[in-house]
Amino acid sequence: MKKEKLRTENISFQYPGAATYALKDVSFSLYEGEWVSVIGQNGSGKSTLAKLLNGLFLPEAGTITVNDTMVLSEETVWDVRKQIGMVFQNPDNQFVGTTVQDDVVFGLENIGMPREQMVERLDQALRLVRMEDFLNDEPHSLSGGQKQRVAIAGVLALQPSILILDEATSMLDPQGRREVVETVRQLVNEKGITVLSITHDLEEAAQSDRVIILNKGEILEEGTPEQIFKSSHMLQEIGLDVPFSVKIAELLKRNEILLQNTHLTMESLVNELWRLHSKK
């Protein structure tokens, strides 16, 4: 059984002056080497959840436990932040160095890491995100996807237990989103890194291992992408959609073209359509 990396138990949070809870009685776990996406419409509590997990806010009720032993509190918040790395929405707002190298080692310099170890961490982190050839490039010369990969490298250099992506692909073009999603999948599959993705991009969520739907601050549903995106009517009722490939598959079904599998990407859908066509 995979090791539990993070657990929330019945956490609730209400902003001062708000009439309702931003999060209410939310419980879930993250496991080693797992990529979980949290989706929901605006106001569902996604961003509040990210802030709670990183200790920017503390829950009014319930507990957040990291690595099965560390419970988030005012006393432990800095230790928790060492275990949870975050990548945010705007890549330009995350750069603090004049080059890729400077940016990735910034956090390591702040904790006084010896230079020899720092160079090793820098090389390792950039290789993980396939940006080792851009060591001396300036941020403005990079694409959006490349900037986010560097931001991920800066977090990975600190070797956290969990990587949280807070709408990390929302400001990227399609190519940039693909680059980041491919990088995340590689980190999970090859390095066993645990990832929580807060996102409104359903195509991105479809690539993860598990999906949690937040609605009005509560967990509405949880399951694999295949399980979640089969319930298109339920998603549409709460203001969400389904991946484009799922929409196309539903249209084909109405026209009596039955597919064997649930397709969460266009590539997968096209491959099955080609197989069906080749049998004719």
From Swiss-Prot:
All copies of domain ABC transporter, residue ranges: 6-241
GO terms assigned for molecular function: ATP binding; ATP hydrolysis activity; ATPase-coupled transmembrane transporter activity
Alphabetically ordered keywords of this record: ATP-binding, Cell membrane, Membrane, Nucleotide-binding, Translocase, Transport
GO cellular component: ATP-binding cassette (ABC) transporter complex
Binding site for ATP: 40-47
EC number: 7.-.-.-
UniProt-annotated location(s): Cell membrane
SUPFAM superfamilies to which the protein is assigned, alphabetical: P-loop containing nucleoside triphosphate hydrolases
PANTHER family named in the record: ENERGY-COUPLING FACTOR TRANSPORTER ATP-BINDING PROTEIN ECFA1, HEAVY METAL TRANSPORTER
Oligomeric form and interacting partners: Forms a stable energy-coupling factor (ECF) transporter complex composed of 2 membrane-embedded substrate-binding proteins (S component), 2 ATP-binding proteins (A component) and 2 transmembrane proteins (T component).
Name assigned to this protein: Energy-coupling factor transporter ATP-binding protein EcfA1
Species the sequence originates in: Bacillus cereus (strain ATCC 10987 / NRS 248)
